[in-house]
Amino acid sequence: MSSSNWEKLKKKLDSAKSGRVEKKHSNEKKYLKSVKGKNNENENSYIVDKKRMNELKKFAKENDIPESQVLDAYGVDASKLTRKTNLETLGKYIAMDCEMVGVADDMSVLARVSIVNYHGHVVYDTYVRPKEKVTDWRTWVSGVKSFHMRDAPSFEKVQAEVAKILDNRVLVGHAVHNDLKVLLLSHPRRMIRDTSRFSGYRKLAKGRTPGLKKLAEVILGRDIQSGQHSSVQDAQATMELYKKVKKEMDEVAFKGLSKS
């Protein structure tokens, strides 16, 4: 996308700071068409052009607009999220968060997995097609909708991809045992850093399990989970919380290893 077209796009979006993104302008329709066309060139790749994605995300941030609204408005299919990545550039530390939906018998199943690296960059993000019939999308909190499953990969495919990413890496998460459980995966205890179990953070909750939203607000000065949850945003916040106390959390993990 040329810089001149991008400037036109930015001008048209100046009115969207209230949270609404208009899509009626002809230039925007052309942009929408071009994005969809390029995305459909390889239906099975689930890769969104990084340059285009970064432009939209940057614009959303600069104008205080939710990323999801900008991406939806400009035709970046949210069901085609980043699923392929270079494992060599992931680094040693990754943070993961999952979103779930409700099925029969008041059970929950996996609907989205997001993984970021040490710097908070998204390295894996995909919706997951449930095997069971969904009885409650929980969109108000999960952000997941039925149309997200249109091209979503199977649970088995996502499980295998996540397992490969986790291999020999330190997994950061908040109550991460829930994420591993829904993925039907395990991970060595010495390679897990769970911010919900860190004593320093538990003190803020008077010994109870601290909520991620509260920790992000108090420790990071960041407002998350105000409406629909974003597993990407939650994973990024969790990684930031870990980095704040990395030395202490690593020491606890090493002590546990020496005792075993």
Swiss-Prot record:
For bias type Basic and acidic residues, the affected ranges are 12-31
An annotated GO BP: rRNA processing
Principal place of residence: nucleus
One GO CC term, this protein: nucleus
Q: Name one GO molecular function term.
A: 3'-5'-RNA exonuclease activity
Q: In terms of domain of life, where is this protein from?
A: Eukaryota
The enzyme's main class, written as a single word, is: hydrolase
Give every Exonuclease domain span: 93-242
Q: Where in the cell is it found?
A: Nucleus
* Enzyme Commission number(s): 3.1.-.-
Q: Which family does it belong to?
A: Belongs to the REXO4 family.
What does the record give as the function of this protein? Answer: Exoribonuclease involved in ribosome biosynthesis. Involved in the processing of ITS1, the internal transcribed spacer localized between the 18S and 5.8S rRNAs.
What name does this protein carry? RNA exonuclease 4
